[in-house]
Amino acid sequence: MSSLAQKKTARLKRQIRVRKKIRGTAERPRLNVFKTAKHIYAQLIDDTCGATLAAASTLLDEVSTGLSYTGNIEAAQKVGAAIAQKALAKEINMVVFDRNGFLYHGRIKALAEAARENGLSF
């Protein structure tokens, strides 16, 4: 198995292990983060009814305007700020952070810190 396949398998194992423990509710939804080489995505998910309450990504025009590249830390900070604003608009202050098996480093850390700076607590 190649090293890239091993990294992906290890991330998926971490994702499954954490998903067994983390549950989002309507009062405290799960802030799910996913990243690719070019984009980063964030969703607020209520696991009791399986609904997405809010979403933000670098695919949105409001986030990607002014960015030369959407796969960097600057883009992740804008996504974190956008998801925090959408959550506060729906009167959601507390979330459960789900890093989706990714290491808390780089873009994931930047998104989380930007969300905290803009009013979310986790």
From Swiss-Prot:
Cited Gene3D superfamilies: 3.30.420.100
Any one of the GO BP annotations: translation
Gene Ontology CC terms, in alphabetical order: cytosolic large ribosomal subunit
Keywords per UniProt: Ribonucleoprotein, Ribosomal protein, RNA-binding, rRNA-binding
GO molecular function, one term: 5S rRNA binding
Ribonucleoprotein is among the record's keywords: yes
Pfam families with a match to the protein in the record: Ribosomal_L18p (PF00861)
NCBIfam families in UniProt: L18_bact (TIGR00060)
Described purpose of this protein according to its UniProt entry: This is one of the proteins that bind and probably mediate the attachment of the 5S RNA into the large ribosomal subunit, where it forms part of the central protuberance.
PANTHER family: 39S RIBOSOMAL PROTEIN L18, MITOCHONDRIAL, LARGE RIBOSOMAL SUBUNIT PROTEIN UL18M
Family: Belongs to the universal ribosomal protein uL18 family.
Subunit-level organization: Part of the 50S ribosomal subunit; part of the 5S rRNA/L5/L18/L25 subcomplex. Contacts the 5S and 23S rRNAs.
Name under which the protein is recorded: Large ribosomal subunit protein uL18
